[in-house]
C-alpha cells in the first residue's frame, strides 16, 4: 500500500511539474520584472507620455510597418544590461507617425540583457511586448508576453531572433 501511494504521489508530482516546466514565460515574476523595466524606460524617456521620438523606418512583420529602435544601457533590479526598445507602428505612412506617434503606436517590443545565467541558451535576453499603455500583451492562450518568450518553440521572439548570432538584426554594434 505504501508503494502504491508513492507511485501515485510521484505520478501526480510529475504530471503537475510538466505544465509548469513547459511555460517558461509569462509568469508572475516575469510580469513583475517587466513592470520594473517599464518604470526604468519611463524614467529614461523611452516610453510613456514624455517619451523622446526618433525617425521611423520601414519595418516588417511581426513588428510593424514602421519602427523606431533605441539602444542604450539600463539598470533593473541592480543589474545593468543592454536595452533595445522598438516602437511598432502601422500600417500608416511615415508622415502620419511623425505627426501623431501616439495615435499610431501599436506595441513596444523590448529586449533587455539580464544577468549571466538568466537564460544562457539565448544570451540572457529578457523579451517583452507591451501595449502602448505599458500593460503586457498576451498570446492567443492569454499568456503574458514577458520573459523567455516562446523558448523552445518554432515561432516567436527567441525562435526568430536566434537566426542572428547576437539576436539583434538591426545593428552590428557590440552589445556586451
Give the positions of each predicted feature.
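Sequence context surrounding c-type heme c attachment/ligation sites in exported
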Residues: 23-26, 30-34, 75-176
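Sparse, context-dependent recognition of short Cys/His-centered cofactor- or disulfide-binding micro-motifs
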Residues: 7, 69, 95
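N-terminal secretory signal peptides
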Residues: 23-86
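Bacterial N-terminal signal peptides
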Residues: 9-17
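Bacterial N-terminal signal peptides that target proteins for export
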Residues: 1-8
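Signals and flexible motifs at protein termini associated with secretion
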Residues: 16-24
Amino acid at each position: 500500500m505504501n508503494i502504491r501511494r508513492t507511485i501515485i504521489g510521484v505520478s501526480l508530482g510529475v504530471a503537475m511539474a510538466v505544465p509548469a516546466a513547459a511555460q517558461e514565460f509569462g509568469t508572475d515574476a516575469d510580469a513583475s520584472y517587466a513592470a520594473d523595466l517599464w518604470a526604468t524606460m519611463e524614467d529614461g524617456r523611452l516610453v510613456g507620455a514624455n517619451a523622446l521620438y526618433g525617425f521611423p523606418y520601414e519595418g516588417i512583420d511581426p513588428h510593424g510597418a514602421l519602427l523606431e529602435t533605441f539602444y542604450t544601457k539600463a539598470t533593473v533590479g541592480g543589474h545593468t544590461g543592454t536595452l533595445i526598445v522598438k516602437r511598432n507602428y502601422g500600417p500608416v505612412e511615415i508622415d502620419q507617425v511623425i505627426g501623431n506617434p501616439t495615435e499610431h503606436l501599436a506595441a513596444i517590443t523590448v529586449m533587455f540583457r539580464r544577468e549571466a545565467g538568466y537564460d544562457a541558451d539565448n544570451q540572457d535576453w529578457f523579451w517583452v511586448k507591451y501595449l502602448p499603455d505599458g500593460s503586457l500583451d498576451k498570446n492567443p492562450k492569454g499568456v503574458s508576453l514577458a520573459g523567455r518568450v516562446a523558448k523552445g518553440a518554432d515561432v516567436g521572439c527567441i525562435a526568430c531572433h536566434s537566426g542572428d548570432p547576437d539576436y539583434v538584426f538591426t545593428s552590428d554594434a557590440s552589445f556586451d
